[in-house]
Curated annotation (Swiss-Prot):
This is the major myelin protein from the central nervous system. It plays an important role in the formation or maintenance of the multilamellar structure of myelin. Pfam families: Myelin_PLP. This is Myelin proteolipid protein. The keyword Phosphoprotein applies. The chain crosses the membrane at residues 11-36, 60-88, 152-178, 239-268. Signal peptide: none annotated. Residues 37-59, 179-238 are extracellular. Residues 2-10, 89-151, 269-277 are cytoplasmic. The modification Phosphothreonine is found at residues 116, 118. The modification Phosphoserine is found at residue 114. It comes from Bos taurus. GO terms for molecular function: structural constituent of myelin sheath. One of its GO terms (biological process) is cell maturation. A lipid is attached at residue 199 (O-palmitoyl threonine).
Length: 277
């Protein structure tokens, strides 16, 4: 069998929904974590430069920002591993479903992979046998997990609910920066507002970013307009928007994973195959 025909047969069993969801998940998490990390750093600089001169006023905020940045590191690592595991689950269950409907058969490629993992002990040294045995044990343990799609449905459902909260929280800084930017637009065009320019302010204390006793805590008028014109403010604003888009993409990917896993599990259950196959 030629390489082209082998690849064509392998593509027949490819879970395209899981492939798209995996790519979207990696893209969304990378965008959310990377842009979110830099946006938090930019926010820290803006606060300590323009909104408060006393370190004690924003010390708690800095600790929270650093904690969120460490959480971002863990989130990126977790989603990379879990996304790869969900993709493997997609291949596993999609192959089982297509075997039920007669649309998928084990190819020579699959047999070759199986032989590579479990067979071919002759002619190997003790080191080669040990490596093959270790790989076989890993694949056996992974197969036990992949043989229970109901677990992945439950875990992915819980993860989707948690990420829905993350998605909602990622909209908060976008809302704050958008309000600040809108105020700056009103200051830049005083003819479009009846309020005095000096009364148009951005108050970090109002959003709980700083305590109420922080000084000055707010910036008004032309000073606020000059802040909005800085590259640092504009970059931070756009980074938060990008992080929000990344959170949305990750949420869509989790929903796609959950729908695909639920469908495969339902088909296997209804066709009398149970959860072990």
């Amino acid at each position: 069998m030629g390489l082209l025909e082998c690849c064509a047969r392998c593509l027949v069993g490819a879970p395209f929904a899981s492939l798209v969801a995996t790519g979207l998940c990696f893209f969304g998490v990378a965008l959310f974590c990377g842009c979110g990390h830099e946006a938090l750093t930019g926010t820290e600089k803006l606060i300590e430069t323009y909104f408060s001169k006393n370190y004690q006023d924003y010390e708690y905020l800095i600790n929270v920002i650093h904690a969120f940045q460490y959480v971002i590191y863990g989130t990126a690592s977790f989603f990379f591993l879990y996304g790869a595991l969900l993709l493997a689950e997609g291949f596993y269950t999609t192959g089982a479903v297509r075997q039920i409907f007669g649309d998928y058969k084990t190819t020579i490629c699959g047999k070759g992979l199986s032989a590579t993992v479990t067979g071919g002990q002759k002619g190997r040294g003790s080191r080669g046998q040990h490596q093959a045995h270790s790989l076989e044990r890993v694949c056996h343990c992974l197969g036990k997990w992949l043989g229970h799609p109901d677990k992945f449905v439950g875990i992915t459902y819980a993860l989707t609910v948690v990420w829905l909260l993350v998605f909602a929280c990622s909209a908060v800084p976008v809302y704050i920066y958008f309000n600040t930017w809108t105020t700056c637009q009103s200051i830049a065009a005083p003819s479009k507002t009846s309020a005095s320019i000096g009364t148009l302010c951005a108050d970090a204390r109002m959003y709980g970013v700083l305590p109420w006793n922080a000084f000055p805590g707010k910036v008004c008028g032309s000073n606020l307009l000059s802040i909005c014109k800085t590259a640092e403010f504009q970059m931070t604003f756009h980074l938060f928007i990008a992080a929000f888009v990344g959170a949305a993409a990750t949420l869509v990917s989790l929903l796609t994973f959950m729908i695909a896993a639920t469908y495969n599990f339902a088909v296997l259950k209804l066709m009398g195959r149970g959860t072990k196959f």
